[in-house]
Amino acid sequence: MGGSASSQLDEGKCAYIRGKTEAAIKNFSPYYSRQYSVAFCNHVRTEVEQQRDLTSQFLKTKPPLAPGTILYEAELSQFSEDIKKWKERYVVVKNDYAVESYENKEAYQRGAAPKCRILPAGGKVLTSEDEYNLLSDRHFPDPLASSEKENTQPFVVLPKEFPVYLWQPFFRHGYFCFHEAADQKRFSALLSDCVRHLNHDYMKQMTFEAQAFLEAVQFFRQEKGHYGSWEMITGDEIQILSNLVMEELLPTLQTDLLPKMKGKKNDRKRTWLGLLEEAYTLVQHQVSEGLSALKEECRALTKGLEGTIRSDMDQIVNSKNYLIGKIKAMVAQPAEKSCLESVQPFLASILEELMGPVSSGFSEVRVLFEKEVNEVSQNFQTTKDSVQLKEHLDRLMNLPLHSVKMEPCYTKVNLLHERLQDLKSRFRFPHIDLVVQRTQNYMQELMENAVFTFEQLLSPHLQGEASKTAVAIEKVKLRVLKQYDYDSSTIRKKIFQEALVQITLPTVQKALASTCKPELQKYEQFIFADHTNMIHVENVYEEILHQILLDETLKVIKEAAILKKHNLFEDNMALPSESVSSLTDLKPPTGSNQASPARRASAILPGVLGSETLSNEVFQESEEEKQPEVPSSLAKGESLSLPGPSPPPDGTEQVIISRVDDPVVNPVATEDTAGLPGTCSSELEFGGTLEDEEPAQEEPEPITASGSLKALRKLLTASVEVPVDSAPVMEEDTNGESHVPQENEEEEEKEPSQAAAIHPDNCEESEVSEREAQPPCPEAHGEELGGFPEVGSPASPPASGGLTEEPLGPMEGELPGEACTLTAHEGRGGKCTEEGDASQQEGCTLGSDPICLSESQVSEEQEEMGGQSSAAQATASVNAEEIKVARIHECQWVVEDAPNPDVLLSHKDDVKEGEGGQESFPELPSEE
């Protein structure tokens, strides 16, 4: 290219540009290779753990447009740089946002190549000649400008009244002209859309390669002392890397070439723009080849690492967490000090300046949507024509792409340029355009989702009567507006979060660059040699700084939401009505670790070990946060009873329990809240509630064998009475250990009517509830747990209302008085065959029904945890054991109505099985 006759760069200058480009790629390669490995490791980890984005969204997401969708086509006047003349061209813009110019419409239709193709990434659209001259002169450092007289001749003579200028940093500028102001407005609005999307669409990509490239650019620029955002990160990776090279080349080209240029100012400017375009094209060509080769090397490297990453994932995660702890200990104090002095005092004021224009822009989008839907509704009520309604709906679907109608919404956000002027001096953040354009893209996205959701919800009602269709239009509109309000709040909080971090992070990075960053090298010793490609101390350091700032920004955003500023919603508010399928895409896949109950529990429990929950959860609205007033049964430590195989005849079960925040590998999915710090385990054990908490009024319907419990309950009308001789035992227990309050005796007399409806199969559940008041036996930690829990007295009267409302739910009520059952699988209380037979004759059915399997397992796990809670409980357990053994022989059942003999027969067999399996359990030593 350099030696051609048309080239304005001589061969020496072209060779110089090639050399600088090659050196830049060589210097950039190590950064990209490191970040590629790190990003690939994170990608594999996300894939293995099946992590999902939990950001709630109620509007349905509109599918992307089909490739080649035409956004604009028209005939207009365009200035041709090659012949220095205006020509009539047929311009087509598709959804790749490239501006293609054809000789005429016929040439386009027959598939001819375009005369020119412009990608306006990084460009600026102007409609005033004065504004264009100011901008172009600012980027043309002419050394002769001061000695030259004022140039009154326009750079381009306009053939028509309404021009559109497209300024670009390293390309020749584009000039277009129109006869009508409406045509000018339509084309300029569309060009602005193209610039916005080309500037930011690449940065929105979630591929690990894109993330690796952007991280590499950030670290590459930091080594040169440039922190924070960069206005030249626009376009795709080839354009961004070419911009990096041109950033280094530009001073040299200006010094070498500008003084040698002759002629008038406009001629020199035109020559300079031609040189820049030629140099940039040369750089882009070489960058494209170099980056392609670099990617192939990185792919080959990660292909060899994939096996190591997958097999050592747990070790890699633990190693990184350990490194985070070490570096955070070093960074935390100076980082927090820098935040306290340079960031915290300004966060609230910056947020206030952001909220006004951004919120007014989203409000304008809402108003526009409502206005367009009202027009559709009024037209239909007038015409009653369903065919015309379909046409109006099609036009409504194209509303987000109608640049002229959307432009008033976008201009509301342009006020940020005036509001955030102080940022340029205080935080050295001159790139407000990036915040504005990103916000405008979010606004367009939300409008797309709103019109798509409206069309989807209305489509089933289009074939009915006209009156019903008109009513449906209004109802669907109101529903979509509610969903829009919630999604708007979520997106705006995300915008504020990103903007605040982007504005303030460079300040903290610069403050710590001289003190903390040099210390990072010594922490590399904590990384295993096999994992040096997947973990880098620089990345961990940046993550920690980002997290510290994120925590600070989330505080001010939450405060604004609590104060209801600009219609921001709180995270735990009652959510608006949503469509059935609005949340279906958010459901985690089957087997997802993140979606498992144990992981959800660990995410909301403070102090859970092993959790890597970062505070980026201002936008993650889990079920527990959405409806805090209705705690689920899982959140209280209860379990869903699933049909499963019965325990083996010997009475033993194998329960695999990992750490608290890991899922329990058994047929029952449980969530355990027994690990709350500072809480007595006896209050939080299965079925218990906190003192200040009200018991749940509604509980999710658990999964059980269909109809079995209901059918058996109808057969039984037995009521349980408290034997008189059990009173002394109760009194002794109350005086000795103070586990049963005095008011229990009164409440127990009031409960026989409720207990009458309880199926004998669920006697074990009562034992679980009664057992919780007793501190666990210290000997229980040394033996394998199995079977069913021991018998004890309740610690406090539970709420039994939930039992009557949800008969299939886990039992929270307790049997009255000292009436209790002797579990056939219990081996710790000695041989109890006689009592077991007696209880069978009295009509109490004992068995190993799988419906109670989960209660047994949860109780066993909680027994282990509760046994370590305090030394006082361990001491009291000796007396408790004596009382338990004594009480076992006093358990009696008084049955008024005999149950179904077939049911008793089947359960008698289960009892015999359980008695046979007693021998497999080690007996506890006598406490006498």
Curated annotation (Swiss-Prot):
GO terms for biological process: negative regulation of protein phosphorylation; positive regulation of protein phosphorylation; positive regulation of translation; response to endoplasmic reticulum stress. Residues 580-596 have a biased composition (Polar residues). The modification Phosphoserine is found at residues 579, 582, 596, 602, 646, 708, 926. Keywords: Cytoplasm, Lipoprotein, Membrane, Myristate, Phosphoprotein, Stress response, Translation regulation. InterPro entries: Niban-like (IPR026088). A lipid is attached at residue 2 (N-myristoyl glycine). Residues 580-600, 618-654, 669-707, 723-877, 899-928 are annotated as: Disordered. Residues 690-701 have a biased composition (Acidic residues). Residues 801-818, 865-877 have a biased composition (Low complexity). It comes from the Eukaryota. Expressed in various types of thyroid tumor such as papillary thyroid carcinomas and oxyphilic thyroid tumors but not in normal thyroid tissue (at protein level). Strongly expressed in heart, skeletal muscle, pancreas, white blood cells and prostate with moderate expression in colon and spleen. Expressed in renal carcinoma cells but not in normal kidney. It is a lipid-anchor. It is found in: Cytoplasm; Membrane. Belongs to the Niban family. 'Niban' means 'second' in Japanese. Regulates phosphorylation of a number of proteins involved in translation regulation including EIF2A, EIF4EBP1 and RPS6KB1. May be involved in the endoplasmic reticulum stress response. This is Protein Niban 1. The gene is NIBAN1.
